[in-house]
Amino acid sequence: MASRTDLFQSPDYYMVDELLSEEHQLIRESVRAYVKKEISPIIEDYAQRAEFPQQIVAQLGELGCFGPTVPIEYGGGGLDYISYGLMMQELERGDSGVRSTASVQGSLVMFPIYAYGNEAQRKKYLPKLGSGEWLGCF
């Protein structure tokens, strides 16, 4: 399997960095480092084979990319929408399909269960979706 080096640089042309809290910067840097280490080196090879790298699902769950705005007690990250946007931006930088996986899991699968499901449904589904043990669909 051929790997590639992630040479992406992210100049702050609009001076957004100075507007971010330390927590937001840490979240962004954590996801950016993950993408550089785990996604960028493998994703082109998977794309050429028309395969999805299944091993990243649990990693994305562990990193908190599934349901980051869902409360912690239900298996989410309990974060704000700025954090969510930064996480998705960094995943997108690595691969659009990876970002789609995370955003569908969090926004189109987990959030509706949290917002409209009953307590039993929240407790049954959200922790396993948040960890990546289960992968939802839309």
Residue ranges and their predicted role:
Residues M1-E23:
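Intrinsic disorder at enzyme termini
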Residues L26, A33, E38-F138:
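Glycine-rich flavin
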